[in-house]
Amino acid sequence: MKLIRISLIFLSLINLSNADSIYKNNFESYELNKFPDDMMEIDGLFKVNKNDQGKKHLEMASEPLTENAVIFGPSIKNSATLEVKVRGFRKRRSFPRFGIGLHGISGFRLRVVPSKNKVELVKNEEPVKSVPFKWNPEKWSILRLQIEFSNDKSLIKGWVWDDGSTPPVEPVITFS
């Protein structure tokens, strides 16, 4: 049996047109062992749990091993940035695959694929670009996805770094 666990500890959604934070969540206000009422499970089973330091986080169940998702925050159609602190756990020869997305199910996603040592930008379930990336299973990861619209064109940028280290100035992956 393969067991893989994914946890989210912080979510932030920013509207780039006026730089206001329109959604923040650290899960501290939610009841333990329940799924938050203001979020929606697409697939998989999720619940609020606590880590060793007592901080609450959203945790995905180890099974079933499928592509799982949670939708949260207000609907956004314009330029925005999403930043999430996430941790995936490796078990034996199994690796997690995790990511974040903007603009709904068919929007762009920034996905970390440790089994292939890469980061991908995905649109409509298909990778549109990938770059090499070495995941650290011992650390929480920070993922930031930014979509900018200008003159009917979009620029998608993705950053990934270990929690506690300095965020990269330049994105690790871009697509236009």
Give the positions of each predicted feature.
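Boundary at the C-terminal end of the N-terminal hydrophobic targeting segment
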Residues: 17-21
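Hydrophobic core
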Residues: 9-16
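Short, aromatic/His-centered strand-loop micro-motif at the edge of beta-sheets
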Residues: 122-144
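Short tryptophan-centered beta-strand motifs in secreted/extracellular beta-sheet-rich domains
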Residues: 27, 84, 138-150, 156-158
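Extracellular glycan-recognition surfaces and repeat-rich motifs
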Residues: 31-57, 66
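Sec-dependent signal peptide recognition
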Residues: 2-9
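Short, solvent-exposed beta-strand-to-loop segments that form ligand-recognition rims
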Residues: 159-176
